Amino acid sequence: MKRLRLYLMAAMTILNGGMMAASAAEYEVSSPNGKVKVMVTAEEAVRWSVTYDGLTVLMPSEIKISLQQAGKSLGLGKVGKVAKKQVKSSFENPFYRKSTVRDDYGQLLMYTNQKMTIEVRAYDDGAAYRLISGHTKPTLVKDELAEFCFEADYQAFVPYVNDNRSGERYCYSFESYYDEQPLSAMFTDSLAITPLAVCLPDGVKAIVMDAGVENYPGMMVRSEKLKVKGEKYKVKGEKLRAVFAPYPLEQEIGGYDRLNLVPTKRADYIAKLNGRQALPWRVVVITERDADILNCDMAQRLAPACRIADTSWIRPGKVAWDWWNNTNISGVNFTSGMNTNTYLYYIDFAAKNHLEYIIIDEGWSGKESLMSELNPEIDLKRLIAYGLEKGVGIILWSSWRNLIGSDPLGGNAVSDQVMKHYADMGIKGFKVDFFDRDDQQVIASAYQLAACAARHHLVLDYHGLKPFGIQRAYPNIFNFEGVKGLENSKWEPRVGDGPLHNQPRYDVTAPYLRMLAGPMDYTPGAMSNAMKDSFFGNNDHPMSQGTRVHQMAMYTTFEAPLQMLADSPTKYMQNQECTDFIAQIPTTFDETITLDGQLGEYTLIARRKGTTWYVAAMTDWTPRDLNVDLSFLGPGQYQADIFADGVNAAKEATDYQHIRQSVSSTDRLAIHLSSGGGWTAIIRANR
């Protein structure tokens, strides 16, 4: 492996209180374990570079911002004083995969002569920087230059922007399969979503993303050629450059089924700042063991702290969902569909199986109003009262546009009226769909909606949007879509002898990348399962690619404080022992341990809630034999309730084995995953 170390200039001096002299041109900060080192040079331009245990992760990559204030052009300015320190801290989060999050890092604070600060952090598992504007007057951000420069043409996992709404370049669903290709093969005319993974030598992964986004657009990237010449480097590499959606000036109703607000005119700037503001973090997560990505807390650490003083009313849980199964229930004496009897039935199913919620998806109201265009076949008051009696909350679907009216930044009155009305009725939350943008207006609107919902004790599930840090500030936002989830199986085409897309491979890629940014509403739980040769897309009677236990393992593997049961009550009742198992799995945890895994190949993870452990493994279409090391268990004997792929699962995907056995911390379980398969267990201490 080519190793390249960067050193501080001999001229650098350290002053009292951790301040460095302004005459220094280079500054270095290290992670607590010393493996991650960030070098910032501040000469003709400001650049950062990152190494991991001597390996070059990022070549010098420019940091720049272009501002305009009262017609005057401003920039980053020249670096003056620099403060350096090590920070050790932690915080609690009861709505996450672990109850306590460590936040230990090395920090540089670099102050410039144009009221800007560059904050740099080095963590044991990555590095990040952000710009902080000290300007108190209204300021336009014309552009921000954020680069991620790599010294070679490395392989990458790239989620491209696609499915643009009404042809608008920056209006899309944030859903994408991963193109696995060299950086040089990236489409230079296309934008990519982050997180995006770059595969470095010796198995090291560098994952590019943003974090802590607020009142600012989200980050996409595009590829560029990198040519560097100088004393330290003579290489031709590849570069990822940040791209931000320009600020919308005009917009109209359009997009999918006219549910979007689509910008028709954008400004020549990306953001408006109305005072001092910290801009989002530019992040590279670094791991040499893929499994560690599944337990990386970078997005949580760099997010704004919780802003809800009393969170005791927030109730994570599982939810029975109607849309994927097309309300196809049987053995009843009424016509199923968007009507009161159907949802009374869903409430009964949820109550019997100890599910906290049901969702009433699109169709309970009109597309233009949540207040005046109500479906006469739905008696909401009756459903709410019945749900209250049964201990089941109701979540309603809404488009983003329905909740905010026609003005993303002026919709507070609309959303407050709607949310107060339905909260007073007894509704527990909204699934907010078709954001399909992350420009500054939409990010600001997402925060406004979350704050409004919190005031009325409502939970939220954001669709058409990826997580960007808001979920820590407002934990009443349970979930985000922005994932190629189970819904895609309804329209997945066949090509040749199988489906067009390799869904099982995506299922063991997204947890490493998409889930790194935050929870994902994949909506698992298909009870109709198929191998490649027998799978086909079907809207009314959908199925999943891979085995039954592949689906069951998702409930432990995929993070979602609000986790869907996507199939119909009929299917779940026909497979009651699978349903009983799924219903026992929590949606938030006290501890997470990653046991094994390989990006795009398989996952093996353990999570603890109280004294009970939940363990799961998933694979792509490649069958695998793995060992589950149970040394994480405490002393004594435990009882393991296990679902494993059946002997014939490679032919009949619904085939499974249900095993109960005694285990202890000294055991290593040999498990077999069938093609597209899974394995999952609940392990409880003997009493």
Outline where the language-model segments fall.
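C-terminal beta-strand-rich structural cap/linker in extracellular carbohydrate-active enzymes
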Residues: 661-687
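Bacterial Sec-dependent N-terminal signal peptides
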Residues: 1-26
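Catalytic cores of secreted or luminal carbohydrate-active enzymes
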Residues: 549, 553-595
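Carbohydrate-binding surface patches
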Residues: 599-635, 679-680
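An acidic-aromatic substrate-binding cleft motif
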Residues: 270, 274-353, 357
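Edge strands and adjacent loops of beta-rich recognition modules
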Residues: 96-102, 581-605
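Aromatic- and carboxylate-enriched substrate-binding clefts and catalytic-loop regions
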Residues: 360-543, 547
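N-terminal accessory beta-strand-rich subdomains and adjacent acidic, glycine-rich linkers
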Residues: 26-302, 306
